Swiss-Prot record:
UniProt subcellular location: Cytoplasm
Task performed by this protein: Catalyzes the attachment of serine to tRNA(Ser). Is also able to aminoacylate tRNA(Sec) with serine, to form the misacylated tRNA L-seryl-tRNA(Sec), which will be further converted into selenocysteinyl-tRNA(Sec).
Record pathway: Aminoacyl-tRNA biosynthesis; selenocysteinyl-tRNA(Sec) biosynthesis; L-seryl-tRNA(Sec) from L-serine and tRNA(Sec): step 1/1
Superkingdom of this protein's organism: Bacteria
Origin organism lineage: Bacteria, Pseudomonadati, Pseudomonadota, Betaproteobacteria, Nitrosomonadales
Pfam families recorded: Seryl_tRNA_N (PF02403), tRNA-synt_2b (PF00587)
Annotated protein name in UniProt: Serine--tRNA ligase
Domain notes for this protein: Consists of two distinct domains, a catalytic core and a N-terminal extension that is involved in tRNA binding.
Length: 427
């Protein structure tokens, strides 16, 4: 959520910066709400002041033994008026809050302008794509050829965009998550957390999934007032660990890592990536989350992205780092790097991690703050990134480490988590 004081101070500048990310700020709506709020607030304060004056007058009249009937009648009328004014003021505050909830974050000054992914800026590349001396197969053919990836079974059990893995492939999937967790906890200083996979609406609002992205979420059928949601990312429960909290400054930065399944309806991606594991309703991800002082957040973003890059480097997977333009960033982000891994069968790079700094946008929604000594609480800055998406990493390994006979070489970095297995072969 944006700081409403920033809007009150310079709504035109905010509108200009939001336009850079393709968002049309409704200045007329904001001005109308603000004008009525100011009017009602002034009338409320005047009525309260008048009531206080009359209350003192009643005391003086009683002290003199004089009649207070008329004054008390006026006080009673003011009480009714105040009740109405305070009710309307509460309604206006709620309307303003809802209005603010629908506004995305402002892009950082370093973010390139642009409408979509075509304006994203390549920052760096690592690794050289392998040259194959045989016909490259995609991960679906490879997994099914191993007899260890079964989409038909998933369709029978649930429906499309799910998968079933067996044997060595299922073990490789598990090994990837364990490798990532151990790397981030032992070398990068993260604390592993286990969190609920089902969260309430307040948690979704805190990180920015609600109200804008309701259709992208799976929810548990209950009353609308008590609706629960399957998490689309561990970002939601992990970041909400600091909701309504005041963290001691000396405890910062907070760095958490969690491995969870993620659930997304993919409502806006009809017809995209319908084959295979690239875009599924359920997938595993290792998520990195940090809460830091405001002045440290952009250095933290560089570090967080580097932690995700280390996973790809240890696995020997070629990738590129992209700085997203203003129009391609997520709703809550002020700046985002995407890491895109090379997929030989598609002959292109595909997103495998998204690392973002949200500045105080999420913290303001959650009232997540820190305190320096006895000072006034300040809003934290929050960051997160995939470290990595497990399923897409598995896809990248299948395609980059495939052999002519259909077997898959297990990357050396994963072999300790695979019991020393060096190759997956057809069952």
């Amino acid at each position: 959520m944006l700081d409403i004081q920033l809007l009150r101070k310079d709504a035109a500048l905010v509108a200009e910066r939001l336009a850079a990310r393709g968002f049309a700020f409704d200045a007329a709506r904001f001005d109308a709400l603000e004008a009525e709020r100011k009017t009602i607030q002034t009338r409320t304060q005047d009525a309260q002041s008048r009531r206080n004056t009359l209350s003192k007058q009643i005391g003086m009249l009683k002290g003199k033994g004089e009649d207070t009937t008329a004054v008390m009648a006026e006080v009673g009328g003011l009480g009714d008026e105040l009740k109405q004014l305070e009710t309307r003021l509460s309604e206006l505050q709620a309307e303003l809050n809802d209005f603010l909830m629908g506004i995305p974050n402002l892009p950082h000054e370093s973010v390139a302008p642009g409408k979509d992914e075509t304006a994203n800026v390549e920052v760096s590349r690592w690794g050289t794509p392998r040259q194959f001396d045989f016909a490259v197969r995609d991960h679906v053919d490879l997994g099914e050829g191993l007899g260890q990836l079964d989409f038909a079974a998933a369709v029978k059990i649930t429906g499309s965009r799910f998968s079933v893995m067996r044997g060595g492939l299922a073990r490789l999937h598990r090994a990837l998550a364990q490798f990532m967790l151990d790397l981030h906890t032992t070398e990068h200083g993260y604390t592993e957390v286990y969190v609920p996979y089902v969260v309430n609406a307040e948690s979704m609002r805190g990180t920015g999934q609600l109200p804008k992205f309701e259709e992208d979420l799976f929810h548990v059928p209950r009353s609308d007032a008590d609706r629960l949601y399957l998490i689309p990312t561990a970002e939601v429960p992990v970041t909400n660990l600091v909701r309504d909290e005041i963290v001691a400054a000396e405890a910062l930065p907070l760095k958490f890592v969690a491995h969870t399944p993620c659930f997304r309806s993919e409502a806006g991606s009809y017809g995209r990536d319908t084959r295979g594991m690239i875009r599924q309703h359920q997938f595993d991800k290792v998520e990195l989350v940090q809460m830091v002082r405001p002045e440290d957040s952009y250095a933290a973003l560089e570090g967080l992205a580097a932690h995700a890059e280390t996973v790809l480097q240890r696995l020997g997977l070629p990738y590129r780092k992209m700085a997203l333009c203003s129009g391609d960033m997520g709703f809550s982000a002020a700046k985002t790097y995407d890491l895109e891994v090379w997929l030989p069968a598609q002959n292109t790079y595909r997103e495998i991690s998204s690392c973002s700094n949200f500045e105080a946008f999420q913290a303001r929604r959650m009232q997540a703050r820190f305190r320096e000594g006895q000072g006034k609480p300040e809003l934290l800055h929050t960051l997160n990134g995939s470290g990595l998406a497990v399923g897409r990493t598995l896809v990248a390994i299948l395609e980059n480490y495939q052999n002519a006979d259909g077997s898959i070489t297990v990357p050396e970095a994963l072999r300790p988590w695979m019991g020393g297995v060096e190759r997956l072969t057809p069952a």
